[in-house]
Curated annotation (Swiss-Prot):
Gene3D superfamilies: Ribonuclease H-like superfamily/Ribonuclease H (3.30.420.10)
Name by which UniProt lists this protein: Ribonuclease H
PROSITE patterns: RNASE_H_1
GO CC list: cytoplasm
Cellular localisation: Cytoplasm
General function of this protein: Endonuclease that specifically degrades the RNA of RNA-DNA hybrids.
Gene encoding the protein: rnhA
Required cofactor(s): Mg(2+)
Organism: Hahella chejuensis (strain KCTC 2396)
Entry's EC annotation: 3.1.26.4
Domain RNase H type-1, residue spans: 1-141
Record field: catalytic activity: Endonucleolytic cleavage to 5'-phosphomonoester
Binding site for Mg(2+) 2: 9, 133
């Protein structure tokens, strides 16, 4: 099974507003950068999209070290999701889970891989997290039609 490192980030100008996601996938000496954006979204949705699209980019099941600066994503996948599923995608308070469409997509993708979810402090100078942030901001620009 291949081992892949993934660094993800999401960005949003205003929240909600135009947003973008970015990810870097590293396998050995090979790197792949992906990004995208949406005109009307939230930062949390873009953080989720970064992880979903990065995992979708893998052509086969892999051992993955996925780094995110989003506690929402990391805690959601490692602590909260199991109970959400048991409760029919409801929170402990009985409310519908926010962004359930993306959580369900992430759940589907994560089941294809052996993933270790890692947290990295955002904007702390970590080079690969900073690159993921740059890609997310490119996604915002693309959504706004500002890329040339």
């Amino acid at each position: 099974m291949k081992t892949v490192e993934i660094y993800t980030d999401g960005a949003c100008k205003k929240n909600p507003g135009p947003g973008g996601w970015g990810a870097i996938l590293i396998y050995g000496k090979n790197e792949k950068e992906i990004y995208g954006g949406e005109l009307d979204t939230t930062n949390n949705r873009m953080e989720l999209m970064a992880a979903i699209e990065a995992l979708r980019a893998l052509k086969q099941g892999c051992k993955v070290e996925l780094y995110t600066d989003s506690q929402y994503v990391r805690k959601g996948i490692t602590e909260w999701m199991q109970n959400w599923i048991k409760k029919g995608w409801r929170t402990s308070g009985g409310d519908p889970v926010k962004n359930v469409d993306l959580w369900q997509a992430l759940d589907k993708e994560r089941n294809k891989h052996d993933i270790s979810w890692r947290w990295v402090k955002g904007h702390s100078g970590h080079p690969l997290n900073e690159r993921a942030d740059e890609l997310a901001n490119l996604g915002v620009k693309e959504a706004l039609g500002e890329t040339g």
